[in-house]
C-alpha cells in the first residue's frame, strides 16, 4: 500500500516541488493550500498535478478540528508555509511572524498528530542554525523573524507526543515554477539591482541551493531524518558579489558590483528602514544589523556540515547556476526587462 503524504502549502514554490518529487517516488500525495495573491494562475487544473487532491483551507484561521479532519488517513506531513524573512509586515513584526510561524504552525502539527500522522517535517530557516552555532551574534534577540523560527522548532518538539518531528533549515533558494513569480524580483532585484549600472552590496558570503534539492531534502527528511533533529540544508557557499554578477550575466547584462565599507552599507540599510517605518512597516530582520553583523562576513553553513546533511538525507548536489538562470528567466522573460 502506498504511503500517503499531506503537504501544507503544496501550491507554493517549495511545496510544489516537494509534491512532484513525492509523486515520482510513488507516494500518494494531497495538498492543503491558500490560494494567495502571489499565485499568478489560480486555475490549478492548468498546471497543478491532477494526481494530487488539493483542498483550499486558510491554515491561519482554520480550527484545529478542521485541520485534523483534513489530515485523517495520512502517514506523513510536510509543512511548507511561510512567510520568510523577505516579507515586510505592518509593525510590530514579532506579532505578525509569531502568529504565522509559531502559533499557526504548531496548530497544524497538533492537528496532524491527532489525525494519526506519524512523522512531520517543517521548513525552517538557516538563521536558526546560525543562532545556534554563533551565539555571540545574538540573532534571535535582535531579529523578530529569527526569534520566531527558533521558537517554532522548539515548540513543535515540545508539544509532540507520538509524532516524529524533523526541522529543515533552508538558505537562499533558486529556481522557478510556472504559476508564481519568484519573490526575488519584487523584494530584491527590482529594488537594488535592475536599472543600476553599478550595484553596491555587502562583501560577505552565504549558502545557496537549487529548489530541486529542497524537494529531495523534504522527502529525505521523511525517509531518513531523525526525530527532533534540526538539519541545515544547502549545496554551495558563494559570495554576494558572485551572486549578483551571475544573476546579471544570466540576462546578458554586465554590471559592476562594488563592495563599499560596511559602515556605508549600514547607512543604506538604515535609509531603507526609515522608509518602512514611515509606512508603519517593520522587517523581521533589522536590516542595519544584518548588514553590519551578517552580510559583511562569510556567514555560511560549513562545507563539512553540508556534506554530512546531504549524505544523511540523500540530497543531491549541483545545478545552482541552472537554477539561478531559471530564476532570472522567470523574473524577466522579455528582452530589455532587466537592464
For the regions a language model picked out, list residue spans one by one.
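Non-catalytic, hydrophobic alpha-helical segments
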Residues: 14, 77, 214, 218, ...
